[in-house]
Amino acid sequence: MSQSDILYSQAKQLIPGGVNSPVRAFNGVGGTPLFIKHADGAYLYDVDGKAYIDYVGSWGPMVLGHNHSAIRNAVIKAAEQGLSFGAPTAAEVEMAQLVTELVPSMDMVRMVNSGTEATMSAIRLARGYTHRDKIIKFEGCYHGHADCLLVKAGSGALTIGQPNSPGVPVDFVKHTLTCTYNDLSSVREAFEQYPQEIACIIVEPVAGNMNCVPPQPEFLPGLRALCDEFGALLIIDEVMTGFRVALSGAQSYYDVEPDITCLGKIIGGGMPVGAFGGRYEVMEKLAPIGPVYQAGTLSGNPIAMAAGLACLKEVSQPGVHQRLTELTDNLAAGLTKSAKAANIPLVVNHVGGMFGIFFTDAETVTCYQDVMNCDIERFKHFFHLMLDEGVYLAPSAFEAGFMSIAHTDEDIQRTVNAAARCFAKLK
């Protein structure tokens, strides 16, 4: 047995499923999850001493690569001053200043501890601001595990919320409407059915939790227009895309201005951090200056602020996003070419430092149903073949891949060469 096998066996006796977040259990691909000992740059090293080119990046935060010296040194320096104060710090002010400079749609920002906290709080704020209860989310989009967002989408353009997790009462999600990603007609149908009741739309500008599905050109501007028409707020969930698709986020890349933005992952540089922010008149509804309550014992934690500031300062350097996009483009082109040579039908979606691999005969993948029509079993086989080659992809056909600027041209070529060998075995 490997050390990962031994540790997983022990973990399953102590931790539900042996993991602290379900996707880590490899249920989407089968087998034993890797237990990681350390990481550096573009590489993970498991407890058995094997190295892997990493395209998970801790599920997005590691845009600079693992164990970046600037972040590590900032954390050490901050920790020497104390771990948590429960009081304001200068670092919080500096972080707020930097974030609002980088994301112009955010006049004010509130720090929290996770992406889930950010989206949950943003929705509460939107409801408090508009005095409306219903929200629109999209089939296949994930915004954290808050009760009102754990909704199963059925067939058809519009689904009145039904929870897809035991423990979530139907009453908690009855105000959640689910529409089809990249389908504006389904959104208009929802607004026309409830013209005075919808508080907000919450959307991933690039859907990253049904693998990687970019928006069609008209989709995000269309959502903005519908929100304006019906008096709802537009919440763009940039937990995954923020500072990765572009320096100012996917909202700048696609030229759409939200009322509220949610951030996470990269903003913490690997530490647990989230944030949400928006226009003055919306954010001023938050306690302690407004009636909408939100709080957190560890919000604005000084260690997390130090890590996030160091990360954002590095990400803001000239050429970072150009290089990130170049690496991702080269990987996508190489995978596509290798699959074609092996007569394996493949679609590779990519934008900025995100990508998604789909085994499908379809020409495009633009929504959840397209993703569900892909060959999931072939992906499982491909995942394990690539793992044997020393390439670590997301262990699920429904999760995006992430590039870092620590990846080299040699890493990309090694990955493409490995994929070519794996495609040949898939025939």
UniProtKB/Swiss-Prot annotation:
BP-aspect Gene Ontology terms: protoporphyrinogen IX biosynthetic process
Q: Which domain of life is it from?
A: Bacteria
Q: Which reaction does it catalyse?
A: (S)-4-amino-5-oxopentanoate = 5-aminolevulinate
Q: In which pathway does it act?
A: Porphyrin-containing compound metabolism; protoporphyrin-IX biosynthesis; 5-aminolevulinate from L-glutamyl-tRNA(Glu): step 2/2
Which cofactors must be present for this protein to function?
pyridoxal 5'-phosphate
Sorted alphabetically, the Gene Ontology cellular component annotations on this record are: cytoplasm
User: Its Enzyme Commission number?
Assistant: 5.4.3.8
What Gene3D superfamilies does the record point to?
Answer: Aspartate Aminotransferase, domain 1, Type I PLP-dependent aspartate aminotransferase-like (Major domain)
Q: Where in the cell is it found?
A: Cytoplasm
Primary subcellular site in the record, as a coarse category: cytoplasm
| Keywords, alphabetical | Cytoplasm, Isomerase, Porphyrin biosynthesis, Pyridoxal phosphate
Annotated coiled-coil segments of the chain:
none
Instruction: List the GO molecular function terms.
Output: glutamate-1-semialdehyde 2,1-aminomutase activity; pyridoxal phosphate binding; transaminase activity
Record PTM N6-(pyridoxal phosphate)lysine, positions in chain: 265
Which family does the record assign? Answer: Belongs to the class-III pyridoxal-phosphate-dependent aminotransferase family. HemL subfamily.
Task: State whether it acts alone or in a complex, and with which partners, per the record.
Answer: Homodimer.
This protein is called: Glutamate-1-semialdehyde 2,1-aminomutase
The species is: Photorhabdus laumondii subsp. laumondii (strain DSM 15139 / CIP 105565 / TT01)
The top of its lineage is:
Bacteria, Pseudomonadati, Pseudomonadota, Gammaproteobacteria, Enterobacterales
Q: What is the primary gene name for this protein?
A: hemL
